[in-house]
């Protein structure tokens, strides 16, 4: 989908030329891409629609994950023949023709475990292996074992795993880190990108691109050999995110690429399909029907693209925070995504240099420098004093402060003075008694107040430390860890998200109940434990008093969350 091209001719910019040269390198590892596995809504057609619409299962993901016991075409033919017969029982038909996903066994930790011991004991519990899957299974096979988040999430998720891997590395499980990098490289080789998760219904989109950072993490243990080994896959993923750029004129967008009027190249989230998500079928149809003024396909695409962002859902994507049907993810240029693209370009430059290709390294450096200028020009709100997303419809930077604003600091793309302003904004508007707020908006969506998420806590902590803002960074870690510890002390589990307006309470909102496990919370908790406790005195639980600032820590904001961005 392209927006109209401007009438005046545009000069070929330096940056697309660089991209052409970078893409030329991809020919060396181009492989035959097999037939893409079809998602269950396509395989099963009206049967899938009917099962989901009558809400046969409380969680729509259940039937999306069910495995047909025979050829779906035969099952569908039987369904069409039987469905109008007297006494037809849809539930019985499904039970006969499908193998439903098993409920995971509830993990009961041994008595008296510390927080660290509990997490270390969870790694094998959350590890799965699926070298082979059934022919019509929505689950995609992976060559190596992998760690799942936990709860209803029975598969590996892209950006979740980076933060899980941080914890694995902290625990010395470098073999598991290597396995998961190998799995993601396999997906790039097989499908041309890393899907949202290893399910057929996730193949039409990706998630925040952390693969290059995963390779960089592995290189901490294996050295430049890891960078050289996975350079082809990093290049291929970059090509996926920049697909279509060679045909863009100023003011146009194509899939995941945006070319602004001055030819600045940035990226957005995008899903290649514009139908309801199989795992949230009924909810998406209801959302689309609730706004008859917009084409349903447009709403479906924006819902899917929000899922690609990892922030599903948030006022960040919505015109009206109380109405999900006003989300327009594809017309927003996200600050976190473009920070990650900058980091990918920097790591590609480093890997190319390690491989002895200095010319290609220079090309990637040129791309990274251009993107950094674009971030500073378009994704900084000078009036508010923080980084924010850019609105393609209004042609202005948005006003809303979110935790995504810390990503330029995390990847070292921020100007020093702006990083200092971000520290002030974070302390004033986002820091709460239980950690960092995702936004300051109460919308009922899970990526809004009062929820705090482990990956965003770590991005903020590490990003602020990168710019010497250690006090604010340590306070974020301290408040969040206290929340995690209090919840663990009471419930003996770690959860997906937390209510940061207090301590000791899991988060709420969103499309499904609170999940426990939980991969990225485990990983970030281990990193933070080792951050707040000195190496000579490591801690297995969160200390009773602030270990760095003994007396007056930075006080979190006590302001009420605002109803609108």
Swiss-Prot record:
PROSITE patterns: TREHALASE_1, TREHALASE_2. GO terms for cellular component: periplasmic space. Disulfide bonds: none annotated. One of its GO terms (biological process) is trehalose catabolic process. HAMAP family: Peripl_trehalase (MF_01060). Monomer. This is Periplasmic trehalase. It comes from Shigella flexneri. The gene is treA.
